[in-house]
Design a protein with these regions (language model features):
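N-terminal ligand-binding/catalytic initiation module
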Residues: 1-25
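Glycine-rich phosphate/diphosphate-binding loop of Rossmann-like nucleotide-binding domains
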Residues: 18-22, 26-130
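Divalent metal-coordination and catalytic microenvironments
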Residues: 35, 134, 190
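Conserved helix-loop functional segments at active or binding sites
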Residues: 40-48, 140, 149, 165
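Short glycine/serine/threonine-rich phosphate/pyrophosphate-binding segments
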Residues: 63-67, 142-146, 168-170, 194-197
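Rossmann-fold NAD(P) dinucleotide-binding segment
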Residues: 123-131, 141-159
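Short, well-ordered coil/turn residues at beta-beta hairpins
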Residues: 135-137, 162
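Adenosine-phosphate binding glycine-rich loop
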Residues: 153-203
């Protein structure tokens, strides 16, 4: 009974909902919120200021969109979004208003905007955009070794896994790509970063 009440509960706090009039539920937002909070907590642990850090987001479903929104609210500059239909790159960072618009005006779980560039173009360019934070929050097993290496060469500090098993390893959990990433940068694994809904289920 608690679950049937809590998961569809409408978020009415203006500090937590991107748009109260849209009627976002706990289930819509909580996983992305947790992904963002894992990054915020990471920088608190290492006594580094998250404001002004730059982030690349992979995906634009509930997890990716909400994570981007909460990170932007915390002062992170979202410099790129890559999704199945295409993407957006803005090296100076998308405004919080733009991120909010992209989230609340979706008609599907994919990125929709007038200035979207093609997938081929964004996939060619985005891995070389300077960013400290990467949020893989699309499908599983998409993230290639070459893409991680390019991001590492452009100041990557932390990967927070919004998707389950985001690395393109043959192994189920911990293969050579994820091992390399974990040696070079901080990797917040899926079972920590994206457990928001699971945590709600344990309520």
């Amino acid at each position: 009974n608690q679950l049937s009440t809590g998961v569809p509960l409408i978020v009415t706090d203006q500090d937590l909902s991107p748009d109260i009039s849209k009627g976002y539920s706990v289930g819509d937002l909580i996983t992305g919120f947790g992904v963002a909070e894992s990054v915020i907590h990471y920088y608190k642990i290492y006594k580094d200021n998250i404001k002004g850090k730059r982030a690349i987001i992979q995906g634009w479903g509930n997890v990716a969109g909400a994570a981007a929104y909460y990170l932007a609210k915390s002062g992170v500059k979202i410099v790129g979004i890559i999704d199945k239909p295409g993407g957006v790159i803005k090296k100076e960072g998308l405004s919080i208003n733009k991120i909010t618009d992209l989230l609340i005006n979706r008609s599907s779980n994919f990125l929709e905007c007038n200035d979207m560039i093609s997938f081929n173009q964004v996939n060619k360019e985005i891995w070389d955009v300077q960013a400290e934070i990467f949020i893989p929050a699309a499908a599983s097993k998409l993230l290639l070794l070459s893409q991680i290496e390019r991001m590492i060469n452009n100041n990557l500090e932390v990967i927070s896994c919004g998707a389950n098993v985001p690395f393109a390893d043959k192994e189920i959990f911990f293969g050579p790509i994820s091992k390399m990433a974990d040696k070079k940068v901080s990797v917040i694994p899926d079972f920590i970063a994206n457990c928001g809904m699971a945590r709600a289920f344990s309520y």
